[in-house]
A protein has these predicted regions:
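Alpha-helical membrane-inserting segments
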Residues: 3, 7, 11, 15, ...
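Transmembrane helix irregularities
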Residues: 14-15, 123-126, 243
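An internal, D/E-rich "acidic patch" concept
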Residues: 42-98
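Alpha-helical transmembrane segments of integral membrane proteins
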Residues: 79-112, 160-312
């Protein structure tokens, strides 16, 4: 995480001068220099970075150059929108991808399986912003049944703002969540399909058939259980990926989350927000990988057996 923070912090010093966006053309060079000194921009990079790390360890990421507000407050405000979008997208990708993957893995030569695999190529081939624009044009412009931007009406619960408790909020999250989930969904479809096809050819499945176990029990109890083990790993990592790549989706749909805040920060060269965002993403990936490793140990008996053998 420190490496990610340092590299990103160093690169941000070459994206432009934030002072140009903070003051007008009539501002004198002396006033610009004084503002740089006040913000600490005249200090060497390693000094700025050390100050950033010390403050970040206390939950302080500085003041936004653009909004003149503490970055930590901005993150707290925008985080609920991103979390809700990512959670819904992850559920759509995991549930739909698993069901379609199982179906195409069991019915390998079916006509519907070919259609599903062909359509899934669109999720991989088309960029996210193109899919988002197409959805907006179809469902918001032509049909007019879903909103094209924004989060809708939200309810303030004190520590959290949610759109799940309002009709407009639920309608507003449909298009961006489906758009964000498509790429991960197609990946899960192909992963589950490949796992099911491989497992159905293994010796213990053939032995189960020889014992007279029903075909449905073999497919949906024995094969599916083992086929979902790698999916859990991918699904966990995909949550971090969805948060990182929600930038494009949030920008297309003007979704007021952290990704949209990051894009605005890049346009304004708001270094405190950009640095805090990337540190947050790195932290999310570290924590998700840690949790997935723990879940993997409890789900996959082979890992427990290896651990018992090595400890014994």
């Amino acid at each position: 995480m420190l490496v990610v923070a340092f590299v990103s912090f160093s690169l941000f010093n070459f994206v432009g001068d934030p002072i140009n966006n903070m003051v007008g053309e009539e501002t004198s060079d002396e006033e610009r220099a004084e503002l740089r000194e006040t913000l600490g921009l005249m200090d060497p990079i390693h000094v700025q970075f050390s100050r950033f790390v010390v403050n970040a360890s206390k939950g302080e990421f500085g003041i936004s150059y653009q909004l003149r507000r503490p970055v930590s407050d901005l993150i707290v405000e925008r985080l609920p929108a991103t979390i809700e979008l990512v959670v819904i997208s992850a559920l759509i990708a995991l549930i739909t991808g698993t069901l379609l993957g199982v179906y195409t893995g069991i019915n390998r030569k079916g006509f519907l399986s070919d259609i599903i695999l062909a359509v899934s190529l669109l999720g991989v081939s088309l960029p996210t912003f193109v899919i988002g624009i197409l959805f907006i044009y179809l469902f918001a412009v032509i049909l007019g049944i879903l909103p094209s931007f924004g989060r809708g009406e939200v309810v303030d619960l004190g520590f959290w703002t949610t759109g799940f408790l309002t009709v407009t909020g639920l309608k507003a999250i449909i298009l961006p969540s489906v758009t964000l989930s498509l790429f991960q969904m197609t990946y899960i479809i192909r992963l589950v399909r490949a796992e099911m096809m491989e497992i159905l050819q293994t010796d213990y499945i053939k032995f189960a058939r020889a014992r007279g176990i029903s075909e449905n029990s073999i497919k949906y109890k024995h094969a599916l259980k083992n086929g979902l083990i790698p999916v859990i790993t991918i699904a966990g990592i995909n949550i971090g990926t969805l948060i990182a790549f929600s930038i494009i989706t949030e920008t297309v749909f003007q979704w007021p989350g952290m990704g949209f805040l990051f894009i605005q920060a890049v346009q304004f060269v708001d270094i405190p927000i950009m640095s805090a965002y990337l540190v947050f993403i790195a932290f999310v990936f570290v924590m998700i990988n840690f949790i997935v490793d723990i879940l993997y140990y409890f789900i996959d008996p082979r890992i427990r057996i290896k651990g018992d053998i090595s400890s014994g």
